[in-house]
């Protein structure tokens, strides 16, 4: 049957990418439908019970700055918060939270159910409906046709998902959920560039059977950091510690003894796993010289005893898993509640995507999340938001939007995907960004909220809060610049006590804040320092501006130098094989990739700086007709 209503945007999948995509499209006024195989699993944390981390926390803040749900949901569900790299510079500091799975799902579902313009429907999607080279809807398992002007596909690990435990395997989207077999087959019919990847998860432990006296406790930060720019510590539920233990020589012997029954090492699994979250089998093989590997025992929630042992992801047979767990200090009598497993699934080469995350070959069809070869909740959420807002923009007849590498980690993520593709599951790190000092967690709102408001994804409450914060940062900065101290006001003894050394001339408080040994609170203790600002985020912005503005200004100059070439658009129908002055290898790589901008072209493997110079010459000449393709 044909569903009586049609939609602007349909989102397929209710994970972290799908929920952000649906919310973003609906916030922009698009009539949106979210289809999921099971409404009870909306926003489920399929693997580890944590959000954030190095690079990942930056993405969460950017999603939040654009009105997304992940950060606020984490503030409402987080049972431990920590700032990683707190002793390092602000560019690489990152927030990480342990989340209660039940509370997190509830927070996401509450937002979905109360979002105007968003409809939920429980049905697995089996088919994409096309009109020529444009998607016009989807068909579900029951044969229901839903029509739409744009479709966002966020299928996670469900496309032809295959679960492995030892040499046993069976079809599943994740343990306990059916796979999307029909949809996977339909996508393969469309001749899109498909591959296989894999990921894994560890066995879960009953915390009542753990001897915590043999582990090291790891408490959260006090005071706890807050994830959302709209958040507050009062949102946080009760806080819980984590614990640290480690593998042993005996653990490694057990693993080596079971490798002949590992699907990974027996050649049963074809997909490539994540380099930066390897299975324990991979760890002891790749790092054979290490006597032990750290394991973090992470609570799954406030109302369960279940513990997630982060660091022993495995697809070894259950009897080997049992022996592994019991060889670990503190887990000698541990009871496994759920076995670990690996899952193999289809993904599609993201080089077939535009920067908007729309597929190049099928108009109106957007991909987000693990289908694009990424790993991680945060990477999925960021892509979902971008795909959802661009799907809405397309239905409104507006130009697509994607941030540049200098504007957001989201921009780095998308550019890496569509330019370089993936050979293994992609995860975000701060090291992937060229302009880290600009792309900090603390200034994600200053970088993106104004753009989000113009796009339509930022609501009035967030916009008002953003403007209040921006104004307060400006006022406090000017106040500190206007308050002066000199040796008469601050004698040598007092100066030595307060700031570590006497001052030899007059300084503004802002000048003194530039000193590496002085923080905001210490400057307020000086004569005329006053009460300062209560908002920790405002104080942080003021202090970072004082200490790092010189470096930031230099990086801005570097960005400006590259921006003109970076954003120079290349014709979509350009026949690179007919351009002279380029090597055959470069022409072939450009012809295959069809980069949208000169910046993307410059990051293609094998494309040299000399080749970019040649393209720049052609661009200035306007790519004359005799150098272009004569027909589409």
Curated annotation (Swiss-Prot):
GO molecular function, one term: flavin adenine dinucleotide binding
GO cellular component, one term: cytosol
Binding site for FAD: 13-18
Gene3D superfamilies: FAD/NAD(P)-binding domain, GidA associated domain, C-terminal subdomain, tRNA uridine 5-carboxymethylaminomethyl modification enzyme MnmG/GidA
Keywords tagged on the record: Cytoplasm, FAD, Flavoprotein, NAD, tRNA processing
Coiled coil spans: none
One of the GO biological process terms: tRNA wobble uridine modification
Co-factor requirement: FAD
Residues that hold NAD(+) according to the record: 273-287
Compartment(s): Cytoplasm
Family affiliation: Belongs to the MnmG family.
Entry function: NAD-binding protein involved in the addition of a carboxymethylaminomethyl (cmnm) group at the wobble position (U34) of certain tRNAs, forming tRNA-cmnm(5)s(2)U34.
Subunit and partners: Homodimer. Heterotetramer of two MnmE and two MnmG subunits.
HAMAP family documented for this protein: MnmG_GidA
Name used for this protein in its record: tRNA uridine 5-carboxymethylaminomethyl modification enzyme MnmG
Organism: Thiobacillus denitrificans (strain ATCC 25259 / T1)
